[in-house]
């Protein structure tokens, strides 16, 4: 090992103010100078001289306690600094300065152990570097007995708070059982709601806490079970609240007086005269009264509007006949537009056909050259069956709910949009195609060619609708 260590960045006079020795270089103590009593430590003044001492594994209780009890050691003395010293060297360390022991510890060279005297070498080699784990002073379990005792002392007081005595446990009775017991023990066999609460709290201390929760459950049990009947107060018993009693037909719901489990659920079949039962009977009659409008005897269920929704007319025009008032209009339009096939339109086979023009939004009409049986080839082109958004004559469609001007404006806008987006279709449109809001006033002089199937095929064809 080097004999001297050069300190950098300081002059000699600076170090003189820190240390008593005026030397700038600090010499190391040879291992041979260390005898069994470690007497050579009396002359050590530096903090780099203990580098031959080995690890802190060989700490004895005497040396550990000495580090805190010896007043001659300075503030820089640590338990690791005196780890390699046996108890016999405690007196020899009194002359060491505070800075002379700060570097003693685990990083020191273990090679100096062989040159030490018999007593220190034997002590250090015998214990080895693992002695710290065996030393009770350094082991974490050294404080285990006191910690365990403290935890037992603290847990003894907490055990009483978690342990619940048997009288305060929740009783194994349902709320119906509690109400039945309270009513049956009363002399008059009926109690008010507050009296039922009081009886339960007097008998079962568990229900003296969280009163709002279980009292709500008591009220629900009284209201929703037919075995409990509300009895109005008599004039000779003034007070607040009605009485509750057991239904006379409920019988013995609990077998052999055991209230742990009900034998059967009581269901009141007939309407009793009591207030609680009449409320239940009124609720039963409610669904029947709601079913009457949809019953078979209701004429609205058999109206043409109801029948036409599921018929063939929903596929052709998307709307049945609105009512009997529209039938004259249907006949007039049939005679005006379908003169050649009027008799065929009135036949039973085509009796379910809708009106040809029953509203302002009706665009599809049968031309004179086509008879009634000619609707089938153009069914997929004109009327777009299966597309509910464009069945304009549906009675509940948005077109029939709108005014004629708004409806025409909507159709004009759709035709204008399609003419811009789909040029092949817009190029084949006739010149009379209404484009713009000005066509509202000039709607009547539409040419007959605009009503041809090819016109509607170009405007409202399947590819256009699917992409919109």
Curated annotation (Swiss-Prot):
It comes from Mus musculus. Keywords: Activator, Chromatin regulator, Developmental protein, DNA-binding, Nucleus, Phosphoprotein, Repressor, Transcription, Transcription regulation. GO terms for biological process: alveolar secondary septum development; anatomical structure formation involved in morphogenesis; chromatin remodeling; connective tissue development; dopaminergic neuron differentiation; dorsal/ventral neural tube patterning; epithelial cell maturation involved in prostate gland development; epithelial tube branching involved in lung morphogenesis. GO terms for cellular component: fibrillar center; microvillus; nucleoplasm; nucleus. PANTHER family: FORKHEAD BOX PROTEIN (PTHR11829), HEPATOCYTE NUCLEAR FACTOR 3-ALPHA (PTHR11829:SF195). It comes from the Eukaryota. Binds DNA as a monomer. Interacts with FOXA2. Interacts with NKX2-1. Interacts with HDAC7. Interacts with the histone H3-H4 heterodimer. Associates with nucleosomes containing histone H2A. Interacts with AR. Interacts with NR0B2. Restricted mainly to endoderm-derived tissues (lung, liver, stomach, and small intestine). Expressed in the prostate. The lineage of its organism: Eukaryota, Metazoa, Chordata, Craniata, Vertebrata. It holds the Pfam family Forkhead_N. Transcription factor that is involved in embryonic development, establishment of tissue-specific gene expression and regulation of gene expression in differentiated tissues. Is thought to act as a 'pioneer' factor opening the compacted chromatin for other proteins through interactions with nucleosomal core histones and thereby replacing linker histones at target enhancer and/or promoter sites. Binds DNA with the consensus sequence 5'-[AC]A[AT]T[AG]TT[GT][AG][CT]T[CT]-3'. Residues 269-396 are annotated as: Disordered. This is Hepatocyte nuclear factor 3-alpha. Residues 251-288 are annotated as: Essential for DNA binding. It is found in: Nucleus. GO terms for molecular function: chromatin binding; DNA binding; DNA-binding transcription factor activity; protein domain specific binding; RNA polymerase II cis-regulatory region sequence-specific DNA binding; sequence-specific DNA binding. Transmembrane segments: none annotated. Residues 273-285 have a biased composition (Gly residues). The keyword Membrane does not apply. Residues 169-260 bind DNA. SMART domains: FH.
């Amino acid at each position: 090992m080097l004999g001297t260590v050069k300190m950098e960045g300081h002059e000699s006079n600076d170090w003189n103010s820190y240390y008593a020795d005026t030397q700038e270089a600090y010499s190391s103590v040879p291992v041979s100078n260390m005898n069994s009593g470690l007497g050579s430590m009396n002359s050590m003044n530096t903090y780099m001289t203990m580098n031959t001492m080995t690890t802190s594994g060989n700490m004895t209780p005497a040396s550990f306690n000495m580090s805190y009890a010896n007043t001659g050691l300075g503030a820089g003395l640590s338990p690791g600094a005196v780890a390699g010293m046996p108890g016999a060297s405690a007196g020899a360390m009194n002359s060491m300065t505070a800075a002379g022991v700060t570097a003693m510890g685990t990083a020191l060279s273990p090679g100096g152990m062989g040159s030490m005297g018999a007593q220190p070498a034997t002590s250090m080699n015998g214990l080895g570097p693992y002695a710290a784990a065996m030393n009770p002073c350094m082991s974490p379990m050294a404080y285990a007995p006191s910690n365990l005792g403290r935890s037992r002392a603290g847990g003894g007081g907490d055990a009483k708070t978690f342990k619940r005595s048997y009288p305060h446990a929740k009783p194994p009775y349902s709320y119906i059982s509690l109400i039945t017991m309270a009513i049956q023990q009363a002399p008059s066999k009926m109690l008010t709601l507050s009296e039922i609460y009081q009886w339960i709290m007097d008998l079962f201390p568990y229900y003296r806490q969280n009163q709002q929760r279980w009292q709500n459950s008591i009220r629900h049990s009284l209201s929703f079970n037919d075995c409990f009947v509300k009895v109005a107060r008599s004039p000779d018993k003034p007070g607040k609240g009605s009485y509750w009693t057991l239904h006379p037909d409920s019988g013995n719901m609990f077998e052999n007086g055991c209230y742990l489990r009900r034998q059967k659920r009581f269901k009141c079949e007939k309407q009793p005269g009591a207030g609680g039962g009449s409320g239940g009977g009124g609720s039963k009659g409610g669904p029947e009264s709601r079913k009457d409008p949809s019953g078979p005897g209701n004429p609205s269920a058999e109206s043409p509007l109801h029948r036409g929704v599921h018929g063939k007319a929903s596929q052709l025009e998307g709307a049945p006949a609105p009512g009997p008032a529209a039938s004259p209009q249907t006949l007039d339009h049939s005679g005006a537009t379908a003169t050649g096939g009027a008799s065929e339109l009135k036949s039973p086979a085509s009796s379910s056909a809708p009106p040809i023009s029953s509203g302002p939004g009706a665009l599809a009409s049968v031309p004179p050259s086509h008879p009634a049986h000619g609707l089938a080839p153009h069914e997929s082109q004109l009327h777009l069956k299966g597309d509910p958004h464009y069945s304009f004559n549906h009675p509940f469609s948005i077109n029939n709910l709108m005014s004629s001007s708004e409806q025409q404006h909507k159709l004009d806008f759709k035709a204008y949009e399609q003419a811009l987006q789909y040029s092949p279709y817009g190029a084949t449109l006739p010149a009379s195609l209404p484009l713009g809001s000005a066509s509202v006033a000039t709607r009547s002089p539409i040419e007959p060619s605009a009503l041809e199937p090819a016109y509607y095929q170009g405007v409202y064809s399947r590819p256009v609708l699917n992409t919109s």
